[in-house]
Amino acid sequence: MTYRRIPLYLSCLFLLALSGCNSKRPPLVEIPEPLEELQTMSPATRQAGSLWDSNQNSLFSDRKASNVGDIVTVLIEEKSSASKNASTKTGKDSSIGASIPNLFGLEKSSIIANNHIDMNNLIGASFKNDFKGAGSTSRSGTLSAALSTQVIVKYPNGQLKIRGGKEVMVNNEVQVIYLTGIIRPVDITAANTINSDKILNARISYTGKGALGDKQEPGWLTRSLDHVWPF
């Protein structure tokens, strides 16, 4: 009876394996909330009898991000390209020869004469080795986007640390863009924007997860074979 149930057990395991292959909705990638690292802001200092507060923005300029909690828009325009070529060529050619015209008179013996042994050409060898190798690699990337970020730290020298992110989900495909870095208030334009090439220690990531991302990766069995395949 036990042997007859084996096909039933195998069928159940097969159905369970198929159920595990069903497409599931990818979880949303959580972006750290910028407000978590905001420093406590002290209240603005006001002077009695004064109509102008020196802690506020200038009367003659547009309002730009300058304090913790303010928002600034980053215009991301990143282009990168790199290429490298290498070639190697080596060669080696060597030869060796030896003769023994006189060897204790044995060169005149019948053994040498009957076998037609030439004592002047006893040893001869040559070796030649050639190697040629060439390789090239190239990589390029382009990223264009506009991302609103928030000031999370204001340093004593006036520089600002910003951080922001955005999630977009279309047809179960999640696209996440994240940015953090340090900027100078003087680089912020009148429209409260700043270019990404003016960000210090910029960390920009653009990732995706979903059906398209899964199709761009090899299966688990292929990846396992790549690790153990010796050829």
Curated annotation (Swiss-Prot):
It is a lipid-anchor. GO terms for cellular component: bacterial-type flagellum basal body, distal rod, L ring; cell outer membrane. The keyword Transcription does not apply. Pfam families: FlgH (PF02107). Keywords: Bacterial flagellum, Cell outer membrane, Lipoprotein, Membrane, Palmitate, Signal. The keyword Cell cycle does not apply. GO terms for molecular function: cytoskeletal motor activity. One of its GO terms (biological process) is bacterial-type flagellum-dependent cell motility. A lipid is attached at residue 21 (S-diacylglycerol cysteine). A lipid is attached at residue 21 (N-palmitoyl cysteine). It is found in: Cell outer membrane; Bacterial flagellum basal body. Residues 1-20 form the signal peptide. Assembles around the rod to form the L-ring and probably protects the motor/basal body from shearing forces during rotation. Belongs to the FlgH family. The basal body constitutes a major portion of the flagellar organelle and consists of four rings (L,P,S, and M) mounted on a central rod. This is Flagellar L-ring protein. It comes from Desulfotalea psychrophila (strain LSv54 / DSM 12343). The gene is flgH.
